[in-house]
Amino acid sequence: MHGKWCVDNERIILVPYYYDIIDDFLSESDMDNYYKTFTHGGFPWTLITKVNENAEENDFQFAHKYIDDRVEVYDGAIEALRPIFRELYFAKYMSKDTEVYRAKTNLFIKTDTSRGLGFHHDITNMGDNYKTIIYYVNNNNGGTRFEDDTFVESVRNRALLFSGKIAHETVTQTDTNFRFNININYNSSSTPLIKENLNES
């Protein structure tokens, strides 16, 4: 886990802005199934004309929603995410009382130059007491950047978990036509991602 130093009322403190990186997160069969599903011609995508509120007007993407505002978008949507939920539960990042706010797959197309698409928080109407997992489906030189300039590269079968307190941005890829990731925002009192007691290790 990683902390972040910041200035708060003229005091320099370590705030609980943590993120974890877990490689080889899913089994090869589950990983391969996601990739084949997303690259199948019949998989439905929705055009998002602006990636986030801080993106440029022409920064677009495609998305496939499973859960939106705590509601399953279609029958079977939660089942499609079961491999990820299962691993999060066994790794103690989720518990039985977990509430999923939003879950979707993102599709970004290749750009001529690598660039950030705007720092943002995924959920803006629920405070910052939530967690995010970004699951990277394929290898490419794009990824996720935090405000402290930490860059997490999009590596196949990698999971990035972090506090909703942390602003982050998508970084586009230049080496593959498509970049896929699964983004899930959730809350669970048992998850270790936010530690209010800084004495905990």
Name each model-derived stretch.
Residues 152-168:
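Conserved metal-binding segment of the jelly-roll/cupin
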Residues 118-120, 167-175:
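Short beta-strand His + acidic residue motifs that chelate non-heme Fe in jelly-roll/DSBH
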Residues 114-119, 128, 136-155:
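A short beta-strand-loop-beta hairpin characteristic of the jelly-roll/cupin
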Residues 20, 95-113:
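A short glycine-rich, His/Asp/Glu-containing loop-to-beta-strand
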Residues 42, 46, 145, 184-201:
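Double-stranded beta-helix
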